[in-house]
């Protein structure tokens, strides 16, 4: 049966979420915008991801955390929901770490994507 599902993400930082979506080459739009399921059930989202089948998905901030909103029956992304969330959370964590290291005066020197899917980040800070 078609219905909108909320999936917990533990994502709290909007800018890092948007950077993570960009890093995964996922096109998104700022909200508020409405998404709906087959039966017309609607939900307003803060970040919208359009799908070719017109059953769009998105993120809504509830309390402190963003939740993924989707009609899972009509999921149309290149990955399963689980893989999508895993990759999104990895990129989100990477963005949080990178932003924090830059704020602390470090500079990114290099990043490597290993065969196992992990990301290796090399930073440095000059002391004067």
From Swiss-Prot:
Subcellular location(s) per record: Plastid, Cyanelle
Gene that this polypeptide is encoded by: ycf35
InterPro entries for this protein: Uncharacterised_Ycf35 (IPR009666)
Residues in coiled coil: none
Protein name: Uncharacterized protein ycf35
GO cellular component assignments: cyanelle
Species of provenance: Cyanophora paradoxa
Similarity comment: Belongs to the ycf35 family.
Keyword vocabulary terms for this entry: Cyanelle, Plastid
């Amino acid at each position: 049966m078609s219905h909108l599902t909320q999936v917990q993400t533990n994502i709290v930082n909007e800018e890092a979420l948007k950077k993570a979506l960009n890093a995964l080459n996922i096109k998104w739009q700022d909200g508020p915008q409405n998404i709906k399921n087959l039966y017309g059930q609607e939900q307003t989202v803060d970040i919208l991801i359009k799908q070719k089948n017109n059953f769009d998905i998105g993120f809504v901030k509830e309390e402190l955390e963003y939740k993924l909103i989707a009609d899972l029956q009509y999921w149309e992304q290149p990955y399963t929901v689980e893989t999508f969330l895993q990759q999104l959370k990895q990129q989100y964590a990477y963005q949080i770490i990178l932003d924090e290291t830059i704020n602390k005066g470090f500079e990114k020197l290099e990043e490597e994507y290993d065969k196992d899917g992990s990301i290796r980040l090399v930073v440095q800070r000059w002391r004067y």
